[in-house]
């Protein structure tokens, strides 16, 4: 059959072969867009269809020029077109944003997260198109090598002028930093990936200069200097610090449209949270990318772009909370029963100052829900290990990152479902029952921890809201969110980021703190310990009494019950201009500190 197909295509005229290629791309493109529209509800805008189709045709032409054989070119083009379009649609349904260049860096972590048929499918989506590409290229033709050199030189040349190139593309194809889904739909997937790849090149290749850092510090210093923590009494013992980051921990009772048969949260937690003023931490992420929540809670600077900071933003040794506490005599221990290298945690934890990192290999996996170790087992084993360490005379910074609570929220036979709903959403039903057990295991642990370490400082919070279905599906019936980030109200943007926060200040008990952006936690912890820390940890102090939650291309600002969402292309001159200059300065200093030359560490100290 292959030989007959070869004979048939070889006997066709050049015009016929090119006509077949163009017709195939048009038909296949239409089919894939139909699947994307009817299954994922994602499709380019009508005005973008011609340019998107033209980009796909250009890709097919390049492929055919390297092959000259339709029987190899057509399957290769089909595989790439399907993978690019459907993976983008799938990611939008899960996270509300399309595929970005940093997602390719994160692919190894995706493979570590998946198992069984899901892992096999993910590998196939990546491997099959590239395997077909290698088979497609006619390596024996001299013309192929000349074209390859030409294409490589062309790509290299564009990368050398990435700044002007992306500026031109922004002018032609538009760009909205806060609405990446809108970018994809107005450009098409191929143009979107090229445009954002060039932007990634510009962003990663240019770090702030000393003059730019000094100008940014001039904006940030007045707010930071006003923050002066009380010193701990001389000779007072150092208190242990326990930071508990709870996977997908959220107040599911807010799902009022789903008919929950009971409150998923343990009544003991509900009372503890009430004593803490029903405080919330404001997270930079939704449904995943826990590493960004970790970065903020440990390093004191916001994540403002749509990438995993541990992988693409944290390149330097940095004065984060673990390092600051280590210099004060603490033993920093991070515990997370996942694959050690997930989200680059081995390198990231080392760079921010943890002395010890316990991952899945350091725990007995004795109480699994699916592949996730229960919180009860994690708490017990971690405290046993801390209690048996050789340097028990040193205070400990105990950073606990739970794994139980990860989508798709499995429970084992020892944890039967206790809650029913009127909602047929399988993920939602699984999640509310998981929260029933997760909150109870937390409270059982807190009772023991507060008994054994009554003076310890305990900080616990959810890392992000749970994923409850494509397009924020689980939240729609309760009118908490809309299915498109671009259409969310100011209150919805707040809801998208807010998870429970409880801070127990030893014998003083829970503290009412209101809304605390996650990146403000390190300075708050040092304040409660009476440790000043380096000046840099105070630079994220916002102007006035504002709570500012940056998100990609926008930020939420709250002040005494008032709230405003400032979007980059839709700035309100009044409330937004007050914080915009501060945020841009903070981004400059953050890039310098964690990825650049660290000029900020050589700057003059804050004026007291």
Language-model features: where?
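Solvent-exposed soluble domains appended to multi-pass membrane proteins
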Residues: 224-232, 236, 243-246, 251-608
